[in-house]
């Protein structure tokens, strides 16, 4: 896994995807494990700066993923990887909710 040391300017430069997922009842551990297994191969992708999955301390079925890519093409490339397709193929059916929201850096007008 590549070292993740970034200056603030690096972190406000790229393409962010914020993902909120909620596992179906009884599926939370499987989903959590699958997200953990995505970290290393995703961080090894050339278009990825950060891939940070989190679990809610208040609701063990709720997860938040912060993804930072070099650009939108990096996100598109990620969705074509074998590890992402394997996750989507087995995990989407275990989710009650999945919401993905992309963001770009804020610049004052």
Where are these regions (language model features)?
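Short S/T/G/P-rich N-terminal loop/turn motif that feeds into the first structured element of a domain
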Residues: 1-50, 56-63, 70-80, 98-109
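C-terminal structural segments of small proteins and small subunits
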Residues: 85-102
């Amino acid at each position: 896994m590549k070292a993740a040391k970034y200056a603030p300017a690096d972190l406000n430069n790229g393409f962010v995807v914020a993902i909120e997922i909620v596992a179906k009842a009884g599926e939370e551990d499987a989903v959590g494990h699958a997200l953990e297994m995505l970290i290393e191969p995703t961080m090894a992708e050339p278009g990825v700066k950060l891939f940070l999955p989190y679990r809610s301390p208040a609701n063990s079925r709720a997860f938040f993923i912060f993804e930072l890519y070099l650009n939108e093409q990096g996100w598109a490339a990620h969705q074509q990887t074998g590890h992402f397709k394997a996750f989507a193929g087995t995990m989407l059916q275990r989710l009650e909710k999945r919401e993905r929201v992309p963001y770009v850096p804020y610049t004052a007008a």
